[in-house]
Amino acid sequence: MATTKMAQPMRGLMGLVATAIRRGWMPGLDSMIAKPHDERWQTTIPAPFFKKTNPAIVTEDHLVEARDGFRVPVRVYKRPGTPEGAPGYFFIHGGGFIDGGVAHCDHVCRELADRSGFVVVGVSYRLAPQHPFPTGLEDCQDVLTWMAKERPGGLDPERLAVGGESAGGNFTSALALWSRDTNGPRIAHHAPIYPLTDFTGSKIDWSANLSGNPGVTPELWDTVGAMYLPDRDFTKPMASVLFADHADLPPALVVTCGHDILRDEGIALAESYAAAGVETKHQHFADMPHGYLLMTRLTKRTYETMDLMIAEAKKRF
């Protein structure tokens, strides 16, 4: 696939990030891995470059009891005056399964709640390597179950959608599989955003697309994969969701971007969904880098994507 030039100002920023990581001025994924789990849980996106928050949104913090007794931190977001029975949207952050928490995507959750009128829920799932597969995914399963049972923010449990970016996009697809296979909470719509779908790396062209993933190398990819999947079974379908049976999944929006090593496996997921009969919309932003959804100061594509997520979900409610 031909690569369109990355849009500014992201192109300049990605170049600066790559230089900073290379010279040790800024931590890359490899140095993040060395930090304590709870420090990585608190990772935020640097506000001067990426983040514009929406302070008008009402938030509530909760601890959701997971199946093993751990209390999973979640945050509920809604507009003031949101009526009882609004749809619920579970948004799951990325971070390579080893970084981030609610704070990582707080600005995105606020914006989604404001633009949609939905009750939005964010989560701090447990991270690898201390908590490898399937712990983080099970945390998300338990939070979705809690949403359906406890109706935080007064949400309607019959109108639930799920979306997430990068690792969160992987969990989004895996939640749809789990809901189908276990008769779990009904998911009306799901939106994997530039998702990781294939831990084997078989679809990655390491000679291209790296400008949108500064600091990521084949060696680092393998290291992170082994942290999340210590048994190195990289084809298990609840982790490498591309290899799952996709029949009878809920309608989906799959978003991919041109400057991303995950581009081709995201496209492959959209194609597999469609081939399995899943009602699928695939949106490809050829000029965007991986992680652009978080860059709310830098590109209107973030808002375009959020509005698309909302519009596609509303069609199913």
Whereabouts are the PLM-identified features?
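A glycine/proline-hinged amphipathic helix-loop "lid/cap" segment
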Residues: 1-76, 317
